[in-house]
């Protein structure tokens, strides 16, 4: 079982923990870490998105943040971000290759695989500054079925129009990234 810190509205651990399953059953506030892999081509920003495996408990088969995961109880955001980047994409990075970009909150209720899912997260956002060859990444097959580069503006425009047919990227997370890149 994976345990998470229950956090207050500012994302600070309260000293209590909850199982990941219970956090999503009851919508209990917990922490996650997201990492954006960003490139530039012909003067335009592009982002590497992962396609979530069909077995994922939420948003199966959709394109999502480059790398993301829950922060285990007792852990801190930066080491968790580095761990997820390594586990999901096979990118082994040192802490100096991740820039802290900001935080955001997300809360929603949906049904996946016929089961209610209540998410309530305080997310720390990082940007990976190292080189990436998408073709040589070692993907965690249980979580990620593929990765693909997308034009950042294309993803942003689609999400702003409310079109969620391809992307489950949190709009607030993309907004933090855009602010970091000076696009706001």
Question: Which ranges hold each PLM region?
Answer:
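Conserved Nudix-box catalytic region and its N-terminal flanking loop in Nudix hydrolases
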Residues: 19-32, 43-91
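Acidic, metal-coordinating catalytic segment for phosphate/diphosphate chemistry
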Residues: 1-43
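Residues immediately flanking
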Residues: 9, 52, 152
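Internal catalytic-core helix/loop-beta-alpha segment
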Residues: 75-113
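Short, hydrophobic/aromatic-rich beta-strand segments within well-structured domains
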Residues: 34-38, 48-49, 125-127
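Nudix hydrolase/Nudix homology domain
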Residues: 21, 61-63, 67, 100-184
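Residue-level detector of high-confidence beta-strand sites
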Residues: 16, 50, 101-103
